[in-house]
Amino acid sequence: MSESVHTNTSLWSKGMKAVIVAQFLSAFGDNALLFATLALLKAQFYPEWSQPILQMVFVGAYILFAPFVGQVADSFAKGRVMMFANGLKLLGAASICFGINPFLGYTLVGVGAAAYSPAKYGILGELTTGSKLVKANGLMEASTIAAILLGSVAGGVLADWHVLVALAACALAYGGAVVANIYIPKLAAARPGQSWNLINMTRSFLNACTSLWRNGETRFSLVGTSLFWGAGVTLRFLLVLWVPVALGITDNATPTYLNAMVAIGIVVGAGAAAKLVTLETVSRCMPAGILIGVVVLIFSLQHELLPAYALLMLIGVMGGFFVVPLNALLQERGKKSVGAGNAIAVQNLGENSAMLLMLGIYSLAVMVGIPVVPIGIGFGALFALAITALWIWQRRH
């Protein structure tokens, strides 16, 4: 690993390429592992309402470690933090392969993901700056969504063939991410020498939360991204139950193909946002956020595969255009106030709290027997109303 502490701010520097490759492999493993583990739950006859619980234990790790992972990212070279985090993911995936309870193994992957996220986004502001930061976020999101696209499909297709093969492929992807992390230049720690007293760390994290919440721009970004990712992860589980009801298809692969359409759309939307939206014109993304909810509502009423594909791709386009500028806004403003690692850790707390809440409501709705189509209609309508309210609030403040 290079010991240089100087950044080549080119969008295609060696360090940036290594970050993007590592992110692709890590996100590929995350998404393949989700669908492979869901297939394992089906094979072992777990109840349907337990499926979102799997994701809830994952995001629970994010919430539990939120006060600490931002400081970890800012106290060490971020490339090494990413390597350690991917090592934890590798251990979690391997444990599921060897028959350990899937919820426990997936929790360990969640711990790795919690440590990984502040470092992967925080390092962007160290490898590039200014106007290139939005473009770097576009590359990161495009890499992530390409991994979602391929990882989701690979997880479902391989699981239809053999669940153990799918799980092993996830472990290999995490191993590749660890190797890619080695090639990220060792940059100076952003905030070395901080106290590791847990009480002080928690207090510092709460201060970072307060600081970001009091700033109108970062509060706007936090609420917007939290709503988006909470809705996004809920949609993934909605599709798993919606496909057999609306389309009459019962395999593991079809929900992954539909999720892939969302992923393709987000790549397109992220690219458009990088060209059309700057930090000064972030509000341009808000109509796209409202349209996400409207299109989800329309999608829930479909009974044919081709319209479902098209509508999910449109949801993805709107999603990419919506979330990329909000991420860039938080990184730029947060880096100057609380540090990039802490800013992303606070963002993770918001996003994963939203995921936990939405998944909990969704799991409860399934448990009490509400049909999946009405769940989808209500979900889309509420999301559109929430983004509309956020936009009105942002314009007033």
Swiss-Prot record:
Its main location: membrane. Catalyzes the facilitated diffusion of 2-acyl-glycero-3-phosphoethanolamine (2-acyl-GPE) into the cell. Coiled coil: none annotated. GO terms for cellular component: plasma membrane. PANTHER family: MACROLIDE-EFFLUX PROTEIN (PTHR43266), MAJOR FACILITATOR SUPERFAMILY (MFS) PROFILE DOMAIN-CONTAINING PROTEIN (PTHR43266:SF2). It comes from the Bacteria. Belongs to the major facilitator superfamily. LplT (TC 2.A.1.42) family. The keyword Cell membrane applies. It is found in: Cell inner membrane. This is Lysophospholipid transporter LplT. Residues 39-52, 112-144, 188-226, 278-280, 326-343, 388-397 are cytoplasmic. Residues 1-17, 74-90, 166, 248-256, 302-304, 365-366 are periplasmic. The chain crosses the membrane at residues 18-38, 53-73, 91-111, 145-165, 167-187, 227-247, 257-277, 281-301, 305-325, 344-364, 367-387. Pfam families: MFS_1. GO terms for molecular function: lysophospholipid:sodium symporter activity. It comes from Escherichia coli O139:H28 (strain E24377A / ETEC). InterPro entries: LysoPLipid__transptr_LplT, MFS, MFS_trans_sf. Gene3D superfamilies: MFS general substrate transporter like domains. It is a multi-pass membrane protein. Keywords: Cell inner membrane, Cell membrane, Lipid transport, Membrane, Transmembrane, Transmembrane helix, Transport.
